[in-house]
């Protein structure tokens, strides 16, 4: 799994046209024809619990992304967690993520 690292990478994805939001997270996506890889970035605010809670949220998001990574289009993606995500059951989060991928037509 390749991650977005620099502020420049994050800013270019934030300015992209494709995004989907629900009550759990905001998904940003930018197609990247030049790269033959998929890159992901996770953003979890300090408004979401303590460090243990934020790491739990990141682990869940990372696992959901890893499960669907093989079927995604090449590009850069950011998952921005919203307040309250730490209280959501894993299955509901997974279903919301899959629905967002379908709505944005990101499944190859």
Locations of regions flagged by a protein language model:
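Positively charged, solvent-exposed patches that mediate nucleic-acid binding
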Residues: 1-108
């Amino acid at each position: 799994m390749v991650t977005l690292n620099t502020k420049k990478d994050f800013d270019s994805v934030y300015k992209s046209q494709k995004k989907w939001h629900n009550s759990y997270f905001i998904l940003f996506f930018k197609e990247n024809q030049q790269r033959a890889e998929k890159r992901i970035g996770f953003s979890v605010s300090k408004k979401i619990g303590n460090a243990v809670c934020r790491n739990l949220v990141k682990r869940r998001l990372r696992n959901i992304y890893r499960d669907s990574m093989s079927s995604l289009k090449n590009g850069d993606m950011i998952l921005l967690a919203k307040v309250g995500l730490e209280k959501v059951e894993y299955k509901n989060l997974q279903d919301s993520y899959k629905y967002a991928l379908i709505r944005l037509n990101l499944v190859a």
